Amino acid sequence: MTAPTGTSATTTRPWTPRIATQLSVLACAAFIYVTAEILPVGALSAIARNLRVSVVLVGTLLSWYALVAAVTTVPLVRWTAHWPRRRALVVSLVCLTVSQLVSALAPNFAVLAAGRVLCAVTHGLLWAVIAPIATRLVPPSHAGRATTSIYIGTSLALVVGSPLTAAMSLMWGWRLAAVCVTGAAAAVALAARLALPEMVLRADQLEHVGRRARHPRNPRLVKVSVLTMIAVTGHFVSYTYIVVIIRDVVGVRGPNLAWLLAAYGVAGLVSVPLVARPLDRWPKGAVIVGMTGLTAAFTLLTALAFGERHTAATALLGTGAIVLWGALATAVSPMLQSAAMRSGGDDPDGASGLYVTAFQIGIMAGALLGGLLYERSLAMMLTASAGLMGVALFGMTVSQHLFENPTLSPGDG
């Protein structure tokens, strides 16, 4: 779709040191953006005390973030479609840098929320362009591996970034954590500007993107986005309360709870590179296996929740289900985004933007539904997750050609 300046996407040796460096920069961008997004999770109490507001009010920062990202993603992607892809990425990272600086200096909650809105606006733009940039750096046969490589940054944000900012918030204050994220975001923005090709669109390619382009109905893309929204909703119904699930359903408490949370994140970190090659060769099979595993994990946790008995055996089964959940929830995301981009034809950025919007809607819907069901029982909450995952799995299984790689045109190399 783009013509990368100084980079050949048709080389027979795609994983050169230069391209590995470029993909690492993209992974760092994903890492710092996700770390900034979830920073309030580990700093809830510290922010609440410092700004003299309730913990509940601070918690709304995440919900409003998802709402702003969902509303602004598609319009912003269309508005910037004619930009070189590197510019869109760097602008997103600069906005993140400014946002974190505003947050670090915020004298009150309103200013903090305003700072968060700035990076929420460009959240969707970054996630709409980052995966397409990765796929354009390598041949089409390596697109899945390129996409999964940037999700390593997402996994590291959960395993390293979030715990690190949480620890800094507890020991030295949340403002210092925000300052550190500011510096890291600025460094990644500079690295992206220096390491990545400009990726300018040709005149014929501009006909397929932007505000003036015609966007015919794409049932395949719509179906991928709807199934993504259902699956993400199912995940976030329970993920918001994963600590409670580990404690009250699995029966793991104290220091072991923290270790199991870490295992959840590490499992996701390990799973991402493992699914890269299968995603390129058997995209539908890889997605079906991942969704089947997620459905099985939620079904097992549901059974344990209804059982209400804690034994060594149930703790072992529950631990396995949590680790499986962590591994596959992280692995399925790049699978679905790859499917969305393949469905987008000549406009993978626009397709990726619609995917990001569906993902953000799923986050909001899952958090809302999870809160309502949590007040009733954990068993009902987990049942909803298992049911929604089952619905998404069924839709993906019966859909024809949903995850197939389209036939490449000669010009695609």
UniProtKB/Swiss-Prot annotation:
Subcellular location: Cell membrane
Its membrane topology: Multi-pass membrane protein
Name of this chain's protein: Chloramphenicol efflux pump MT0201
UniProt induction comment: Expression is negatively regulated by the transcriptional repressor MT1396.
Source organism (scientific name): Mycobacterium tuberculosis (strain CDC 1551 / Oshkosh)
Classification lineage: Bacteria, Bacillati, Actinomycetota, Actinomycetes, Mycobacteriales
Pfam family, one: MFS_1
Entry keyword annotation includes Kinase: no
Keywords for the protein's UniProt record, in alphabetical order: Antibiotic resistance, Cell membrane, Membrane, Transmembrane, Transmembrane helix, Transport
An annotated GO BP: response to antibiotic
Function: Active efflux pump that plays an important role in chloramphenicol resistance.
Major place of residence: membrane
Transmembrane stretches, start-end: 23-43, 55-75, 89-109, 110-130, 150-170, 176-196, 226-246, 256-276, 286-306, 312-332, 353-373, 378-398
Family label: Belongs to the major facilitator superfamily.
GO molecular function: transmembrane transporter activity
Keyword Transmembrane assigned: yes
GO cellular component: plasma membrane
